[in-house]
């Protein structure tokens, strides 16, 4: 297993966990881009958004049920951003589908 996030989920690499259930693992980013920066990943290895299929899309729907719970627990009542990079040109550095929750300050309108 060479996937960094698979190793984190397995407990082989430590992380600052903020949420876990049978399908999803969420932890604080080690290089935060905002005061609150959490990564939410499916436990099943899916390489990117391009790997979402009819067979595994339920986990993505579940992630979007979990994200508001995490945001509320983190005190992000005034807003937060959810981002997923897909592919090298988009800035995806770990090839395991993940969603960034960014918040804790007023975020810039520019996305790129």
Protein language model annotation of sequence segments:
Residues 1-112:
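HIT superfamily nucleotide-processing domains
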